[in-house]
Structures are given as structure tokens and as C-alpha cells.
From Swiss-Prot:
PANTHER family: CYTOKININ DEHYDROGENASE 2 (PTHR13878:SF161), GULONOLACTONE OXIDASE (PTHR13878). Residues 74-255 form the FAD-binding PCMH-type domain. One of its GO terms (biological process) is cytokinin metabolic process. The gene is CKX2. It comes from Oryza sativa subsp. japonica (Rice). GO terms for cellular component: extracellular region. The keyword Nucleotide-binding does not apply. Residues 1-20 form the signal peptide. Belongs to the oxygen-dependent FAD-linked oxidoreductase family. This is Cytokinin dehydrogenase 2. Glycans are attached at N64, N464. InterPro entries: Cytok_DH_C_sf, Cytokinin_DH_FAD/cytokin-bd, FAD-bd_PCMH, FAD-bd_PCMH-like_sf, FAD-bd_PCMH_sub1, FAD-bd_PCMH_sub2, FAD-linked_Oxase-like_C, FAD-linked_Oxidoreductases_BP. It comes from the Eukaryota. It is found in: Secreted, Extracellular space. Glycosylated.
Length: 565
């Protein structure tokens, strides 16, 4: 009874807060007015806003592409926003939608880091997941580390950077990350969650012990590989189509204290990718060779006329005292040498970027890292004299992209349109892609953002989960490419989107069987043909029919926009 009284008091306080802070109410569209009236009869009514400021914010995302004014927005704005105080509020909303003859769309929104409106709910309700950690003082209770069990229970709304901090306080850490940690647990697990650790540990979805999920029919389910495994596999990498993740149990390992952050410079894609593949050759038939497994993190990037916007992702913080340049990983003298090498190489260089973790309870010593570096310098086929290294805090290395974000925000270059393109490529097509795209399409214009390229091991991915990677062509290795550009000037968005289309067209002509990561397609037919294919589409539809038959969830993805049953 006391608990319910506290809840009602919180609802009343929130209702007063919303009324005090919201601008004048925004009239809902005719299509949404009736269901908004119905929601007024629910116990969650005080948690719902339908004002223009709230719905506009919930309908925007990191991509900012509709804001850029290039063409018409692909999706209508949300009609309302739910600010839940507990998972049961989300379940009540979904049951209310499911009970209607014409169900309204519902989408969970974490940090809004999608780039094509994937988390939008056209004429429906966006769920502001961050509210779960704010209301009732519940943030701490929704992020709990079990030292004995070696896991962390994190609410779906929790940021990975906070998961890191909570775990590190106990000398522990998750092992698989994204490069940017200011994303929600539920958001990355709905896609895959990849970074330079994925070659060894798999994506984040391969590192989950248990989930709490609310399905499209409003059922609250705890699932794992042992309990409701089909739902567990469906939700992980499921693009928000089968349920809302409200809790994830993530395994932990002893945390290192430091990271040796290194860059090896190459003049050809062939040399760099060959070395990357040697470095990730762990747990593979044929052995790891002299360098396999020596690094804990392996990525790579393409150097194309870099400036602040292009290098923000991998700048150490604070800057080296010996450097006044915008790219503080290098001294001024080293940056001049790299620029000269780039000119000799025709304007394109490749950086193999890696890290070796050390210190802490179970990590190697600094002396052991020095020995590994000696082997790497000797064995890798980089340009001699072009190896750069810094020792940084482990947590600082993982959160390095945030430092770049702060620099871009200070320069007014963060909240701009981001027409990003992320691809998975078969190993057989990566060199043709490098030749046609890095040395062709992208070389004709300024880079305007980081360009990443690195390999992963197929056997670290679970094919029962919903995430889609390149077709199994018998090759253990496949690649991810991230072309992460910012449209800072007028006219950039249209030009960059046209260039993205040109890149995809090049892949089609060259026979490179790519898959989009963080995908965006304009129709269900394209999703079926280009993304899932004949083998995976039937399973995806079957799971949708089972867990969200009225296609309420995540309509912004454009996969299902009308009920299946």
C-alpha cells in the first residue's frame, strides 16, 4: 500500500512538472486524437505529453537529416511521448495500443542516436527510456553490479559509460563495447554493438546473460538462452521489432588499469588488412601466428585530407604537451611526416589502430606490453618509422570518442546532419571496395568525417540472433566499414547522400555482397530482398507474428507498418 502511495505521489509530481514546463499544448492530428483521448483513461496518463516541444524532440535523432531540409521527412512526427516511471508503464501503453482496432505506433527512444528516424513513432507514442532511471530516484537501483556473480544488471535506459563506471568501481568491466559509450544499453543491444574488441569477444549481443523484455502485446518476460530463448535471440539485434529491453544482465571480467594505444601507418589497404587479419586470428584453425591475439582491440581507419571534423573520433585527451595540432595523437613534427607520406602515397593512408590492455588485477605488466610491441614492430608490414603509441587510462581509452564530441560541440560541429553509412563487407570484396571507394569516390571530395575499416571473426556472432551480417561464403573473416561524415555546410547533406548512393551502386556493379549495419531501407520489399534475404526473412516474419503481431513496435524502421494478424 505504501509503495503504491509513493508511486501516485510521484505521478502527481511529474504531472505538475510537465504542466509547469511544457509550452502550450500542441493539437494532435486527427488520426491520433482518438487514441490520445483513450490514454487519458489509463493510470499512466500523467506520464504522457503531447505538446509540440516534447514530440519534436522525441521525433528528432542524431542524423538530423529531416531537419536539414533536404526533401520531405520520411516519417511523421510522434503524437505523444511517454515518460515511464517503471517498466509496467510501458507494458500498459503497449496493451492499450494492442487493444485498439487500429493500433498506434510505439517506439523506445534512448539517446536518439539513429540517423534515419529509426526510433520514431509516426503519429504514435515515443517512450522516453531515460525516464526510467530518473524517476523515483531509481537510477542506482537500475544499475547494480554483482561482484560474486561477475555481472551487472543494467536498465535498458542506462548509458554504457555509466555501466563502465559502476563496474570499474569494483575492479570489473564488460568486455565488448561500442566506440561511443554515451549510448543506451537497450539501444546498442537492439542493433549489435560493435567495436575493436568484437574480433575476440563478439559484438555486445554475444555478451548478454539475461534480458527483461516487454513484447509488442505488453507481456513482461525475463528471457535468456535457457528461458524463452527464441525471444532472447529475437530481441538481440532485432532492431526493436520484438520487444523493449528494460534490463540486461552483462557478464564482467577483471578490469585492466591502462591501455597502450597504438597506430601503425600503411600506404596500401592490402598491407593493412592483411596485418589486421593476422592480429585477429584467435581461436581459428591454422593457428594465430606470431602476432595473433597480441592486441586486445583492433580497428583501422582511412586518412583522407584530415582536419578537426575528420579526426575527432581518435584524439587523446588531454592533448600531448608536445603538440599544438588539431590531431594531438601526433607531435607537430610527426604530423608533418605523416602528411608528407600521404602526399607520396597519392593522398590516402591507412592507420591500423589498436590497444593492448595492462595493469589491474589480471592484466599483463608494462614490461610485457613492451615485449609485445617489439614483436608487432618487427612482424607487421607497416611503413617503418611510422609507429605511434601512448599509454592512457583504460576507461579513458574506451571513452575517447566523447572527448572528440566535446571538441566538436565547442566548435558548433556536433549537432549537424550526419548522413552516415555503415556496411558489412565480405572479405573477398574489401580490396575492390578500397580501390573504388577510398581511392575513387571519396578521394574526390574532402573527407568530412572518420572512415573506419576493420575485420571481425564470424564465429563470434550467434546466427540464431536477429542481427544480419554478410552471407556465409565460407570465409571466417568479414569487414565493417563506417563512413561517418558530418554535413556542416549548406548543400552538404544532399551531396553526401548522393555519394552514399554512389558507393552502394559501386558495390552492386562490383558484385560486393554488402549488408548495411544500422540499416535503412525505404520499403518492406527492400528489407526482404537486400537485408534479410530468402533465408532469414521467414524467421524474422515468424518472430514478428509471435511477439508483435499488430506491428506496433519500431515502425520507424520501415520493416512492418501494418498488422500481421
Amino acid at each position: 500500500m505504501k509503495q503504491e502511495q509513493v508511486r501516485m505521489a510521484v505521478l502527481l509530481m511529474l504531472n505538475c512538472f510537465v504542466k509547469a514546463t511544457a509550452p502550450p499544448p500542441w493539437p494532435p492530428s486527427a488520426s491520433s486524437a482518438s487514441f490520445l483521448d483513450d490514454l487519458g483513461d489509463l493510470g499512466i496518463a500523467p506520464l504522457i505529453r503531447a505538446d509540440e516541444a516534447g514530440t519534436a524532440r522525441a521525433s528528432a535523432d542524431f542524423g538530423n537529416l529531416s531537419v536539414a531540409g533536404v526533401g520531405a521527412p520520411r516519417l511523421a512526427a510522434a503524437a505523444a511521448v511517454l515518460y515511464p516511471s517503471r517498466p509496467a508503464d510501458i507494458a500498459a501503453l503497449l496493451r492499450a495500443s494492442c487493444a485498439r482496432p487500429a493500433p498506434f505506433a510505439v517506439s523506445a527512444r534512448g539517446c536518439g542516436h539513429s540517423v534515419h528516424g529509426q526510433a520514431s513513432a509516426p503519429d504514435g507514442v515515443v517512450v522516453d527510456m531515460a525516464s526510467l532511471g530518473r524517476l523515483q530516484g531509481g537510477g542506482a537501483r537500475r544499475l547494480a553490479v554483482s561482484v560474486e556473480g561477475r555481472y551487472v544488471d543494467a536498465g535498458g535506459e542506462q548509458l554504457w559509460v555509466d555501466v563502465l563506471r559502476a563496474s570499474m568501481a569494483h575492479g570489473l568491466t564488460p568486455v565488448s563495447w561500442t566506440d561511443y559509450l554515451h549510448l543506451t544499453v537497450g539501444g546498442t543491444l537492439s542493433n549489435a554493438g560493435i567495436s575493436g574488441q568484437a574480433f575476440r569477444h563478439g559484438p555486445q549481443i554475444s555478451n548478454v546473460l539475461e534480458l527483461d523484455v516487454i513484447t509488442g502485446v505488453g507481456e513482461m518476460v525475463t528471457c535468456s538462452k535457457e528461458k524463452a530463448p527464441d525471444l532472447f535471440d529475437a530481441v538481440l539485434g532485432g532492431l526493436g521489432q520484438f520487444g523493449v529491453i528494460t534490463r540486461a544482465r552483462i557478464p564482467l571480467a577483471p578490469a585492466p588499469a591502462r591501455a597502450r594505444w597504438v597506430r601503425f601507418v600503411y600506404t596500401t589497404a592490402a598491407a593493412m588488412t592483411a596485418d589486421q587479419e593476422r592480429l585477429i586470428a584467435v581461436d581459428r584453425a591454422g593457428g594465430a601466428g606470431a602476432v595473433g591475439g597480441l592486441m586486445d582491440y583492433v580497428e583501422g581507419s582511412v586518412h583522407l585530407n584530415q582536419g578537426l571534423v575528420e579526426t575527432w573520433r581518435t584524439q587523446p585527451q588531454p592533448p600531448s604537451p608536445s603538440s599544438s595540432s588539431s590531431s594531438s595523437f601526433f607531435s607537430d613534427a610527426d604530423e608533418a611526416r605523416v602528411a608528407a607520406l600521404a602526399k607520396e602515397a597519392g593522398g590516402v593512408l591507412y592507420f591500423l589502430e589498436g590497444a593492448i590492455y595492462f595493469g589491474g588485477a589480471a592484466g599483463p605488466s608494462a614490461a610485457d606490453v613492451d615485449k609485445r610491441m617489439d614483436v608487432l614492430r618487427r612482424e607487421l608490414r607497416h611503413e617503418r618509422g611510422f609507429v605511434f603509441a601512448q599509454d592512457v587510462a583504460y576507461a579513458g581509452f574506451l571513452d575517447r570518442v566523447h572527448d572528440g564530441e566535446l571538441k566538436l560541440r565547442a566548435a558548433g560541429l556536433w549537432d549537424v546532419p550526419h548522413p552516415w553509412l555503415n556496411l558489412f563487407l565480405p572479405r573477398s570484396g574489401v580490396l575492390a571496395f578500397a580501390d573504388g571507394v577510398f581511392h575513387g569516390i571519396l578521394s574526390r571530395t574532402p573527407a568530412m568525417g572518420p572512415v573506419l575499416i576493420y575485420p571481425m571473426n564470424r564465429n563470434k556472432w550467434d546466427s540464431n540472433m536477429s542481427a544480419v551480417i554478410t552471407d556465409d561464403d565460407g570465409d571466417e573473416v568479414f569487414y565493417t566499414v563506417g563512413i561517418l561524415r558530418s554535413a556542416a555546410a549548406a548543400g552538404d547533406v544532399g551531396r553526401l547522400e548522393e555519394q552514399n548512393d554512389e558507393i552502394l551502386g559501386f558495390c552492386e556493379v562490383a558484385g560486393i555482397a554488402y549488408k548495411q549495419y544500422l540499416p535503412y531501407y525505404g520499403s518492406q520489399a527492400e528489407w526482404q530482398k537486400r537485408h534479410f534475404g530468402a533465408n532469414l526473412w521467414p524467421r524474422f516474419v515468424q518472430r514478428k507474428s509471435k511477439y508483435d503481431p499488430k506491428a506496433i513496435l519500431s515502425r520507424g524502421q520501415g520493416i512492418f507498418t501494418s498488422p500481421l494478424a
